[in-house]
Amino acid sequence: MNKSKSNSINRRQFLYGAGVGVAMFSILPGCATRGGRRLSQNDKLNVAGIGIGSRGGADVGEVAGLGENIVALCDVDENYAAKEFAKYPNARRFTDYRVMLDKLGKEIDGVVIGTPDHTHAVIAMEAMRRGKHVYCEKPLAHSVHEVRALMAA
């Protein structure tokens, strides 16, 4: 009996795509005015990726696939992230997220964080303090102290 190879997506891919879609369309656009730009429902979000070498690159790709603008990419390892940098030739490149937020602060509506776990809270807090919306891989924080600091940001 021959089994033909299916081109359909599996459950994991569907849930991942649905999760990213829900996060970006229900969290960011509804309140994407705090960062300096006023958005209408027809405007595309200007999103920056922080930590794009592996999983973060996949997250940025999902956001780009939803039609949003990828305006900046940041990764400390330019060689490892070169493949992702090449996918978005119009996005500005950075190796320090703080410099990126300083230079492009008013142009960025939200950030996608795909850095190592222990850096999530610090980067998310800095982005939130600057009025940016955050999509972050889990865990967002490692302690109650970090969670409280994020809530205050």
PLM features per residue range, with description:
Residues 2-22:
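N-terminal secretory signal peptides and thylakoid transit peptides that target proteins
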Residues 18-88:
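N-terminal Rossmann-like dinucleotide-binding module
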